[in-house]
Amino acid sequence: GVRMSILVKEDEGRIRVSIRSRRGTSANGCARQFFNGGGHENAAGGRLDVPKDIPGIEAAAEYIERHTHIYLNGDNE
């Protein structure tokens, strides 16, 4: 089943993310580790700044997919 969902919005040269998770998966942990953010255990938010975190807006989807996979699976694939 779905453990975490991420809503993505472009806003003035940065990417804003809104993260929601089910009990047992920390939205806050993911936001703090990969998205310069934080919040509550199952509802958090963050951002990706261009070019500090990603080279351009077009790189956001790949970054989010890769780092969410790392967070949820504890690996680097």
Region annotations inferred by a language model:
Residues 1-77:
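Glycine-rich, acidic loop segments that terminate in or are immediately followed by a histidine
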